[in-house]
């Protein structure tokens, strides 16, 4: 342990990382640099600075960075261009924040000359994988300290006891009723784990939810919302141009007011176990619905289907911590290329937990052609007779398979009606132009042909005999 002289700690000021800070000082006897990221979690971050100072951290070794714009612009928006959802439900609010934190940890290591990084992820979770894969991808030789894989403080109760023993200030409001929820928040979502949520059959308490009202208590009047997209990203809300992080903050506010974005799920962790978590993702829920709506009129069918095929793989890469991997980067290039035409406006209606698409339009890139799609007279824009051949060609393999199945089952196979012989049309002679000479000739009476005289047979003469 003595070879580590300085470590950069991902520090939130909460229970886990406050205990880790003291533990690093006691066990590793090293200099600690703290990094606290402002990801839009909605908490005052200055208390984290005060806690770090109280723990003996030098002011120059305390980093508190506002990374909200970078987070949404370079991580959340690229992920939503892919319509990313993990296992059909989870919008990856925690997962997508980890690669940015790992990136900033390595940058601070390079700035301060630190030997290692340290994180507060448990040995059971996904975050340990995400932090460390990111760190190794960006700085292959970096050392990593993961206290949960080293110490004997294996429960939140033991953490609180350690904190009390060493005079570490923590929120103790749940002390009598049990451990507090394990929560993680950023501009995209807030998550809840632990306590009675460890029973997947138990309903979450209403008092747990922080960002959204219950749909039952949401306003009785719907609210309309216009989102403008440019190359797959929202750039304006109700006609007002906004920065990326401002867009998501506003959508969180509007969605929370209407009870949008609550989620209770059991997910499959990368380490192999199932885990129950509750999430509030109001802005992300609105963003996903709107993005799919604008793509519905601006993306070619096969391109859209290809994106849908690739999305689960992309989601797994993000969830499992492979944001900085070559395969995720390659997929991103493809996805971003598809977004060049994803421009336009989507109109939504927010009502009691629902995001309802009521309109979508692109003045420059819409592939929706009403002259072809109409149920009225299309003036020949689409020849419906063409559909017959299209259907027969696409049915060919189905008919062949059905015939084969019939033969195997011993059923008579319907014979195809014999085709009628095709007669070749005799080409009509092309009429020659009538000349004056021909016309005059036509006016003269036609002379009757002379009757052919009968041909007389030749008379044979007798052959004279020779004298003896």
Curated annotation (Swiss-Prot):
Keywords, alphabetical: Amino-acid biosynthesis, Arginine biosynthesis, ATP-binding, Cytoplasm, Ligase, Nucleotide-binding
Region (Disordered): 445-468
Comp. bias (Low complexity): 445-457
Pathway connected to this protein: Amino-acid biosynthesis; L-arginine biosynthesis; L-arginine from L-ornithine and carbamoyl phosphate: step 2/3
Class of enzymatic activity (EC top level): ligase
Assembly with partners or alone: Homotetramer.
SUPFAM superfamilies noted in UniProt: Adenine nucleotide alpha hydrolases-like, Argininosuccinate synthetase, C-terminal domain
Compositional bias ranges of the Basic residues kind: 458-468
Family to which this protein belongs: Belongs to the argininosuccinate synthase family. Type 1 subfamily.
Entry protein name: Argininosuccinate synthase
Cellular component GO terms, alphabetical: cytoplasm
Keyword Amino-acid biosynthesis attributed: yes
